[in-house]
Amino acid sequence: AGRLVATDVHTISRLDDDYNQDFLAAADVLFMSDELLPIPPEAWAAEIMARYAPQVLVIGLGAQGALLAVQRDRFVGRFPAASVRPVVSTIGAGDALFSAFVHGFVRTGDPYHALRQAIVFSAYKIGVTSAADGFLNQTALDRLCQDVLI
């Protein structure tokens, strides 16, 4: 008790997905990709929030950014992608978005700020070839976020 449970189920196409059922039910922060969704992300988010009630849901939309749903505010909205440097490789983009969001959310408790920073972090990350490179520390991320409007 008292611990935040954050999980990324990656690609999912069914609310009753056997493999992900426990993850969906336990998550306070739930991430997924829009790649296999059978309905528009906003409709999917409404179903996820009604059935599983995570505090926060983020659906990665690739080059279109991300969709955020926040239970306490009854908010559902899209955040655009950021462009901070040329895209070299999108390998690790989703993991970068997830990890940066969790870091920001745990640090501030603000899912809106956390997602904006995570989008910038992920946009920076995809500007390198290797999945093991292209990371920013908090100071560098804060500085970069001042120059990027999301």
Predicted regions located by residue number:
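Conserved beta-alpha-beta core of the PfkB/ribokinase-like small-molecule kinase fold
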Residues: 1-47, 64-65
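Conserved phosphate-binding/catalytic region of the ribokinase-like
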Residues: 43-150
